[in-house]
Amino acid sequence: MSQVLEHLESAETDFLFFSQTICPYCTRAERTLDAHGLTYTEVNLDHHEGLREDVVTETRHRTVPVVFDLRGDEPVFVGGSDNLLEYL
């Protein structure tokens, strides 16, 4: 099982997003989710060796944040910060 799937399956929140330490768009995603009263799990790619490559392979999304909606039966790949704003 990929590291991405492990994180998606273990999260017990409304959303999960992959981030990096210095990332204004990740902060924007956090603030957006907070403003909508949604819970989220943040996974910092800087702290998980090889995870960034797995995220790119699974989503083809090369920038952070990489956001998933976990509220349904299956995780939904939302995209990045701009995509999240449109999605909500």
Predicted region positions:
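Nucleotide phosphate-binding site architecture
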Residues: 24, 46, 85
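Structural micro-motif
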Residues: 59-68, 81
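Thiol-based oxidoreductase modules, predominantly thioredoxin-like and allied folds used
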Residues: 38-52, 61-62
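Short amphipathic alpha-helix with an adjacent loop that forms part of the alpha/beta core around
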Residues: 52-59, 88
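Acidic phosphotransfer microenvironment of two-component signaling modules
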Residues: 21, 49, 82
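Local sequence-structure signature of Cys/Sec-based thiol-disulfide redox active-site neighborhoods
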Residues: 2-41
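Alpha-helical elements of the RecA-like P-loop NTPase motor core of helicases
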Residues: 27, 31, 53, 86
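Non-catalytic, surface beta->alpha helical segment in thiol-disulfide oxidoreductase systems
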Residues: 69-88
